C-alpha cells in the first residue's frame, strides 16, 4: 500500500462535510479550494485533528512545497474583512497549476503531484552542493612557470580556465579581495597577482624542484642529482623565484651528424613526486652500488640448456596423447591407462550393484515363501521375482567372466618404461640402450685371413 502524503490528506479533508465551514471546494471551480486561516476553529478542528499541530504558517508552507499557488482575487467576505469588520472571515483560495488536484481526482492522479526538492537528504542532513565557481587556490610560483613557458596570455584566457568565472575562492574560507591592475593584459594572467600568499610546504617545494628539473634536464641532464627530489621537512626552504626556476635559455637541438653525438647524448630522466620516506634514499643508493650478477661461461655447462632438456624429457614421458619413440623403444600411451582404469571402475561398480540386487530379491522371495496367507496376486509377483532373479544371476556370471578375461589381457600387456633424466646431449637414455645386446660378430685374425681362400 502506498504511503499517504500531504496531498492525499488534504484531498480527504476537503471531502469531509463537517469541516466545510473552514476549508471547502469552490462551488464554481472544482480545481480551487478555500480556507479561513484566521479562524480559530480552523486551527483547532482541522489542523490539530488531521496534522497533530495548529500552526497555520506550517500548513501554508507545505502547500507551497507541493506547488500550490495562492490566488490574489479577493472574495466579498475578504474585502469586507480587510476594511476592518471581521478578521475571521478572511478566505484564501489555492489551486495547483498542473491541474491534477481537483474534486474528483483519485489516488493515482494525486501521486503525480510531487514535493519540491529542498536539498535535504532522507537522513535529514543537508546535501553539500558546491557551486561551479568554488575553486581551490593554485600555487603562485607554479603559475609563474606556466606563464613563462606559454608566453603572454590574453585577459580572456584565465576566465576560461576555471569554468568561465573570474571570481575564485574556496568554500571553506571567505572570498579574498581581488584587485586587478590595469597593466595585466601585457604581463600575463591576473590570477597570479590576486592569489593570497601561502607558506611553503613540503608538497610545494617538491613541485618546484620537479618543475626545475623538467625545464633544465634537456640541456643539463647531470646537473640535478637524485638528492634534490627528497626534501627534508625539518628544514624550511624559501619559495624559488621565477628567474631561478627558468634557468639558462634552452638551445634548439639539431640533427645528430656523427656517432660521437649519439654516445654523448642522454635522455632526460624525470622523477615524479613520491611519498617522503627517511630510508628511501639510503635504500636506493645501496641498490645502485650492488654489482650486477655475472653470467658463467658457456663451457661451464654440460649442456647448453640443461633445465630445458630435463623438462623436455619429463614432458615426453608424461605425454598423454602421443607415444615417445627413442632408441627403438616405444612407450605406451597414457590415455590408454586412464581408459583402462575407468573401465575397471565401471565393471567393479556394476558387479557390486548386481550382487546387491540379487541378494535383496533372494531375501524377499525367501521371506515371502514362509508366509502362508498369500493371495493369487502374490503368487504372480513371486513368479516375476523369480524370473528377474534368474536374469540377474546370469548377468552376474557374465560380468565375472568378463572381468577374468580383462585381467588376463592386462597381464599380457607390457608396462611403461620410464625415461631417465640426462645432463649430456651426447648420451640419451643410457640405461635403455645398455640393456640391448648386439649380435656377436666373429673376430678374424691376420693369419686366418691369409689362410682363408678368397671367394668370388
UniProtKB/Swiss-Prot annotation:
Source species: Saccharomyces cerevisiae (strain ATCC 204508 / S288c) (Baker's yeast)
Sequence similarity: Belongs to the HSF family.
Taxonomy, superkingdom: Eukaryota
InterPro entries: HSF_DNA-bd, WH-like_DNA-bd_sf, WH_DNA-bd_sf
Location in or out of the cell: Nucleus
Renumbered residue ranges of the record's region Disordered: 229-299
Low complexity biased stretches: 231-246, 253-267, 283-299
SMART domains: HSF
Record's protein name: Protein MGA1
Gene Ontology BP terms: pseudohyphal growth
DNA-binding region: 3-118
Pfam families the record matches: HSF_DNA-bind (PF00447)
GO molecular function: DNA-binding transcription factor activity; sequence-specific DNA binding
Gene3D superfamilies referenced in this protein's UniProt entry, alphabetically: Winged helix-like DNA-binding domain superfamily/Winged helix DNA-binding domain (1.10.10.10)
Keywords, in A-Z order: DNA-binding, Nucleus
GO cellular component: chromatin; nucleus
Amino acid at each position: 500500500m502506498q504511503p499517504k502524503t500531504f496531498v492525499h490528506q488534504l484531498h480527504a479533508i476537503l471531502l469531509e462535510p463537517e469541516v466545510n465551514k473552514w476549508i471547502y471546494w469552490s462551488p464554481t471551480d472544482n480545481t480551487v479550494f478555500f480556507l479561513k486561516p484566521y479562524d480559530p476553529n480552523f486551527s483547532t478542528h482541522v489542523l490539530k485533528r488531521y496534522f497533530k499541530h495548529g500552526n497555520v504558517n506550517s500548513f501554508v508552507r507545505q502547500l507551497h512545497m507541493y506547488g500550490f499557488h495562492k490566488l490574489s482575487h479577493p472574495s466579498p467576505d475578504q474585502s469586507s474583512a480587510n476594511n476592518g469588520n471581521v478578521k475571521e472571515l478572511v478566505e484564501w483560495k489555492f489551486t495547483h497549476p498542473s491541474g491534477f488536484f481537483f474534486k474528483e481526482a483519485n489516488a493515482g492522479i494525486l501521486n503525480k503531484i510531487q514535493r519540491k526538492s529542498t536539498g535535504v537528504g532522507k537522513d535529514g542532513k543537508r546535501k553539500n552542493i558546491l557551486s561551479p565557481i568554488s575553486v581551490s587556490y593554485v600555487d603562485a610560483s607554479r603559475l609563474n612557470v606556466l606563464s613563462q613557458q606559454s608566453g603572454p596570455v590574453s585577459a580572456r584566457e584565465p576566465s576560461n580556465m576555471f569554468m568561465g568565472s573570474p571570481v575564485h575562492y574556496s568554500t571553506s574560507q571567505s572570498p579574498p579581495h581581488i584587485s586587478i591592475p590595469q597593466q595585466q593584459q601585457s604581463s600575463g594572467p591576473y590570477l597570479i597577482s590576486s592569489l593570497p600568499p601561502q607558506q611553503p610546504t613540503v608538497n610545494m617545494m617538491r613541485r618546484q624542484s620537479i618543475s626545475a628539473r623538467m625545464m633544465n634536464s634537456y640541456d643539463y641532464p647531470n646537473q640535478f642529482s637524485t638528492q634534490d627530489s627528497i626534501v627534508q621537512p625539518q628544514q624550511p626552504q624559501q619559495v624559488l623565484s621565477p628567474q631561478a626556476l627558468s634557468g639558462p635559455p634552452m638551445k634548439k637541438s639539431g640533427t645528430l651528424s656523427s656517432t660521437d653525438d649519439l654516445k654523448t647524448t642522454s635522455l632526460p630522466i624525470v622523477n615524479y613526486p613520491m611519498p617522503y620516506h627517511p630510508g628511501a634514499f639510503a635504500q636506493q643508493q645501496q641498490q645502485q652500488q650492488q654489482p650486477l650478477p655475472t653470467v658463467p661461461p658457456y663451457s661451464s655447462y654440460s649442456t647448453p640448456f640443461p633445465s630445458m632438456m630435463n623438462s623436455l624429457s619429463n614432458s615426453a614421458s608424461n605425454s598423454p596423447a602421443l607415444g615417445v619413440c627413442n632408441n627403438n623403444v616405444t612407450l605406451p600411451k597414457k590415455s590408454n591407462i586412464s581408459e583402462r582404469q575407468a573401465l575397471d571402475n565401471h565393471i567393479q561398480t556394476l558387479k557390486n550393484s548386481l550382487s546387491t540386487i540379487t541378494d535383496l530379491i533372494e531375501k524377499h522371495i525367501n521371506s515371502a515363501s514362509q508366509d502362508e496367507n498369500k493371495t493369487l496376486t502374490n503368487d504372480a509377483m513371486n513368479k516375476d521375482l523369480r524370473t528377474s532373479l534368474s536374469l540377474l544371476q546370469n548377468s552376474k556370471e557374465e560380468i565375472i567372466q568378463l572381468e577374468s578375461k580383462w585381467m588376463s589381457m592386462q597381464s599380457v600387456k607390457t608396462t611403461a618404461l620410464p625415461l631417465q633424466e640426462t645432463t649430456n646431449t651426447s648420451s640419451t637414455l643410457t640405461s635403455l640402450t645398455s640393456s640391448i645386446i648386439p649380435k656377436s660378430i666373429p673376430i678374424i685374425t691376420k693369419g686366418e685371413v691369409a689362410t682363408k681362400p678368397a671367394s668370388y
